[in-house]
Amino acid sequence: MKITLLPGDGIGVEIVDAAVEVLDAAAKKYNFTVEYDKKLIGGAAIDAFGTPLPEETLASAKASDAVLLGAVGGPKWDNVDPSIRPEKGLLNIRKGLGLYCNLRPMKVSKYTAHLSPLKTERAEGADLLIVRELTGGIYFGTHNEAHLNADGVEEASDIEMYTRPEVERIASFAFEAARKRGGKVTSVDKANVLGSSRMWRKIVTEMRDKEYPDVELNHFYVDNCAMQLVLNPKQFDVVLTNNIFGDILSDEASTIAGSIGLLPSASLGDGAGMYEPIHGSAPDIAGQGIANPLATILSVAMMLRYSLNQDAAADAVERAVDEVLEAGYRTPDLWAEGLKKVSTAEMGKLVAEAVK
């Protein structure tokens, strides 16, 4: 199995190194072989090649079974031409790989529930997966910048549009994911106002009735879903959303977990999937050995499950993370009195040993 490693910028190098140690441990235990190809992306690529996504990086990613990304960006590149900002590398590799499905799991364990802004009893045990459509909707519709209309009034517009195939492929992924989890999909829309949402709801309902009768389906308006995530996050299993609603709801859900240092993500298409923590490059702590690698390690677990077909290894990595947290080990961002403070590399080693 070939994995393209994209450490990127800031703490990306440290957290990817820790995650690779865990992946190697899983490969050894479950008897599969991993080959790595390390490439540049983001600011590091700008410094070396003058572009945030060199051709050789994209070529490597396309030839891989999966891509593991650290993080991109930092103040060093704030004043470069907007067309070559580090974040452009991320957008362009997603486009180049044809990634249309973003997965954002949010799980609150008993070891981390106290970090949530919600009451512990409300947050603990929450375990949901947001399935967000990535390539359609208002972000990719027709954009009309501010201009004067025929009446001399300034106006601007952005068009939300989806096609049936776009809805079907993302809904299919959500239903399949639900079959492997709690068997429930909550589809989010604004069908009381938007025509695109009414079509979305119709297609999702048809698919459930025809292809997934074993999966429970309910529909929430996006405003109600945002409220229910706070009131009772444990009611959700798989949350299916369009692009803009998923952008907002996934960030809301991440705050419930209490620490972005624990949250992985995956972006999938028909080829290689890309896996990354949801946090940024944190250049202020880069090189100090204090970054939390657990989100990247849990992204490796997602990679094992969704791209490498190694479900047992994925389960083992997730169990190993829980075991290390249960034993009281924490990186500085999660440390409190009575716990054992460890470095980035030490945390990676502890999880790798727990996998073994």
Where are these regions (language model features)?
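N-terminal beta-loop-helix "entrance" segment that forms/cooperates
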Residues: N31-E55, M227-L229
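Buried hydrophobic positions in well-ordered alpha/beta secondary-structure cores of metabolic enzymes
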Residues: D9-G12, D65, V131, A174, ...
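Generic secondary-structure signature for well-ordered alpha-helical cores
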Residues: D24, K28-F32, A63-A66, K95-N102, ...
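Glycine-rich phosphate/nucleotide-binding loop
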Residues: G43-I46, L229-Y329
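Glycine-rich phosphate/diphosphate-binding loop of Rossmann-like nucleotide-binding domains
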Residues: T4-E21, A26-A27, A150-D223, Q235
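Short acidic loop-to-helix transition motifs that present clustered carboxylates
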Residues: G42, Y111, F220-M227
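N-terminal glycine-rich phosphate/adenylate-binding segment common to multiple enzyme folds
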Residues: D47-S157, I244-G246
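Glycine-rich phosphate/pyrophosphate-binding loop and the adjoining helix
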Residues: T135-G136, G141-R181, V185-S187, A191-V193, ...
